[in-house]
UniProtKB/Swiss-Prot annotation:
Family: Belongs to the binding-protein-dependent transport system permease family. MalFG subfamily.
Any Gene Ontology biological process: transmembrane transport
Topological relation to the membrane, as annotated: Multi-pass membrane protein
Full protein name: Lactose transport system permease protein LacG
């Protein structure tokens, strides 16, 4: 029996640590769900059991927020921005891997170096550019800085190394143009890579807070993230209402991740199917 226990001890320790880590990760979400059913005073007192104020908190949130509008703003920015980022960045990654040029590696290195520049250093120049272009207080101004993402370009170039070059060569022999090879062959073959990139970029766009806070000024252009933040920073915040908004803001990213979890893992592992 002692021998069996010694053999299983590493597994017991491993699963205990993983269980603790999982609990610590999910506890804030559980506490947030419980908080939606309690009043502000109960939450401040630290109540960790379910209450009876759920419908009051929901009614309060919908009374203060134009939920369809802010959700539409968030969905539009997230989906359109993600689609544009995947298109531009995958084209760039494909080009850097497939085409030979003396300047290729130099340009690629410059793009990667931009990853070392903090976004805070770019905010003022970007804000001035958007102002000169007349794009302040528009959703286009939120999407543009993300379209050519250095990380996603790097990700697609690395994934493109696993793309079978025989397919490209055979397509060229059959007379296909480069854009046809990209859209009709490369994209379907690399769908797991696209799925993983979609999850990453969608979450970044959906949770984007600082840049929209600076650019979006009118209430009819704001996203769910900004609205929930404004409720939380009010002079006398209603925490139950804030938690309702936080859950509503969190659900889309969770749904996207769980719906595409298998493809996400395949894409991150470099799977090409």
């Amino acid at each position: 029996m002692m021998t069996t226990l010694r053999r299983r001890l590493p597994d017991i320790v491993q699963y205990s640590v993983l269980s603790l880590a999982a609990f610590l990760s999910i506890f804030p979400f559980i506490w947030m769900v419980i908080g939606t059913t309690n009043t502000t005073s109960q939450i401040i007192r630290g109540k960790v059991t379910f209450g009876t104020a759920l419908f009051d908190n929901i009614a309060s949130f919908f009374a203060q927020v134009d939920v369809p509008l802010v959700f539409w703003n968030s969905v539009k920015i997230a989906l359109v921005g993600t689609a544009l980022t995947l298109l531009v960045s995958s084209l760039a990654g494909y080009g850097f891997e497939m085409f030979r040029s003396k300047l290729r590696e130099r340009v690629y290195t410059v793009i990667l170096l931009t990853l070392m520049v903090p976004f805070a250093a770019l905010m003022i120049p970007l804000f001035m550019l958007m102002g000169q272009a007349g794009l302040l207080n528009t959703h286009i101004a939120i999407m543009l800085p993300m379209i050519a993402s250095a990380f996603i370009i790097f990700y697609f170039r690395q994934a493109s190394k696993a793309f079978p070059t025989e397919l490209r060569d055979a397509a060229k022999v059959d007379g296909l143009k480069e854009w046809q090879i990209f859209f009709y062959i490369y994209v379907p073959v690399m769908r797991s890579t696209y799925a993983a990139a979609f999850v990453i970029v969608f979450m970044l766009n959906w949770n984007n807070y600082l840049w929209p806070l600076i650019v979006l000024q009118s209430n009819d252009t704001k996203t769910i993230t900004l609205v929930v933040s404004s409720l939380a920073s009010a002079y006398s915040p209603e925490y139950g209402t804030v938690m309702i908004g936080t859950i509503l803001a969190t659900l889309p990213t969770l749904l996207v991740f769980f719906a595409m979890q298998r493809q996400f893992v395949q894409g991150m592992l470099g799977s090409v199917k």
